[in-house]
Regions:
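Intrinsically disordered, low-complexity terminal regions
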Residues: 1-344
C-alpha cells in the first residue's frame, strides 16, 4: 500500500476532472475511497490489537524446550514444577484479521516441547505473510530443562535455567541470569549481557552491532566477539580465552590459571586486563598506535633486566616478557589503542 497509494489517489483525481458533470454523490464516494486508503496506509499508528494464547505441557524435569519466533520478545524462567507453561500474546497495529495470519504451534514429543511461530497466507493480505504481527512469549520451564531459543526480531531474557541454554536472535538483546550451563548467547544487532553464567565446556557469546558484558562467568573456554561494541568482563575465570573486537574496547577483570591460554585481538580499541594474584604468565603484546603498561614487574631478556624491562614495557609498542612462573600464555594485539595489565 505504501507504493500504490499515490497512484490510486492520482487516478481518482484524474477521474474526478474527466467526470466533472457527475453528481455530488459520486464525488463523495471518491473522497471516501481516498480517505479509506489513507487510513490503511497509516495503519501502523492504529490502536494495538491483541490475542492471547495459553498452554501447559507436562514434561520430565530434564526435558528439552525449543522456541522459534519471528518477531517479538521471549522471556523464559526456570521453575520448580514439572511442566512447561506457555503464555503468548499476538500483537498488531493493523486490522484485527491480521492476527489470524500468524499461528502458534506446540509440538510434544518424548521429553521434548517445540514451540513455533508460523505465518499463514490470507486473502485480505493478498498472499503476503503476516509480517505485521509480533508474538511475545512468557514461558516457565522446569529449572533443569535444556532450552534452545531462536528469533529474527526480538529480545530474549532467560533466568534460572539450570540445563543447557542456547539463545540466538538477529535483532534484539540477549540477557541471561543464573544459567550454569550456558553454551551460546548471540545477537546480530543488540547487546549481550550475562550474569552468573557458566559452562561445563566452551561458551560462546557475540554481537555484531552491540556490546558484550559478563559478570561472574565460569567456563573452561570462552569465545567472545563484537564488530561494533565494547566487551566488558568482570569476575571471570576460564582456562582458555579468545576475544575478537573490531571497533570497541576490551576489559577483562578476573583470574588467569596455570597453563591457561588467553588471546585478545582488537583493531580499534584499548585493552585492559585487571588480574587477581596470577601465578605467572608469558606476555606477547603489540599495539601499532598506543602504549603498553604493566603493573606487574615483567622480565624482558632476563632477571637482571627486571626493573629496566618494567620501565620499557610502558613505552614499547611491542614486547615479549614474563611474569612469575610464566605458566600461562597471554597474547594481546591492538592496532589502535593502549594495552594495560593492572593489579586487582
Amino acid at each position: 500500500m505504501r507504493f500504490t497509494l499515490p497512484f490510486v489517489m492520482a487516478g481518482l483525481a484524474m477521474a474526478a476532472v474527466s467526470a466533472g458533470a457527475q453528481d455530488a454523490d459520486q464525488r463523495i464516494v471518491r473522497r471516501d475511497a481516498v480517505r479509506a486508503g489513507a487510513r490503511a496506509y497509516q495503519g501502523r499508528n492504529a490502536p494495538e490489537q491483541t490475542e492471547r494464547f495459553s498452554r501447559k505441557v507436562k514434561v520430565g524435569r530434564d526435558a528439552r524446550v525449543s522456541i522459534d519466533n519471528v518477531a517479538g520478545n521471549i522471556v523464559v524462567t526456570g521453575g520448580s514444577g514439572d511442566e512447561v507453561s506457555i503464555e503468548a500474546v499476538k500483537r498488531t497495529r493493523g486490522d484485527r484479521s491480521e492476527l489470524a495470519t500468524v499461528r502458534i504451534t506446540v509440538d510434544e514429543r518424548a521429553g521434548r516441547v517445540e514451540v513455533r511461530t508460523e505465518g499463514e497466507q490470507n486473502r485480505s493480505n493478498r498472499g503476503r505473510r503476516g509480517s505485521q504481527v509480533s508474538v511475545d512469549y512468557t514461558v516457565t520451564v522446569p529449572a533443569s530443562a535444556s532450552v534452545d531459543l531462536h528469533s529474527v526480531s526480538g529480545s530474549m531474557r532467560v533466568t534460572g535455567v539450570r540445563g543447557s541454554l542456547r539463545a540466538e536472535t538477529v535483532s534484539g538483546n540477549v540477557t541471561t541470569t543464573d544459567t550454569p550451563k550456558l553454551e551460546v548467547a548471540k545477537s546480530i544487532s543488540g547487546d549481550v549481557s550475562l550474569t552468573g553464567a557458566a559452562a561445563e565446556g566452551d561458551l560462546s557469546a557475540a554481537s555484531v552491532s552491540g556490546s558484550v558484558t559478563a559478570r561472574g562467568l565460569r567456563a573452561h573456554g570462552l569465545g567472545l566477539g563484537s564488530i561494533s561494541g565494547d566487551i566488558i568482563l568482570s569476575d571471570v575465570t576460564c582456562d582458555r580465552l579468545g576475544i575478537k573486537s573490531v571497533s570497541g574496547s576490551v576489559e577483562y577483570a578476573g583470574s588467569i590459571l596455570k597453563g591457561g591460554r588467553y588471546e585478545i585481538n582488537s583493531h580499534s580499541g584499548s585493552v585492559r586486563l585487571t588480574l587477581s594474584n596470577p601465578p605467572g604468565f608469558e606476555l606477547t603484546a603489540n599495539s601499532f598506535s598506543g602504549t603498553i603498561r604493566s603493573d606487574f614487574p615483567l622480565i624482558i631478556g632476563g632477571d637482571r633486566d627486571r626493573d629496566r624491562g618494567r620501565r620499557r614495557g610502558a613505552d614499547n609498542r611491542s614486547i615479549r616478557a614474563t611474569f612469575g612462573d610464566g605458566s600461562a600464555t597471554v597474547t594481546i594485539r591492538t592496532f589502535s589503542g593502549d594495552i594495560v595489565i593492572a593489579k586487582r
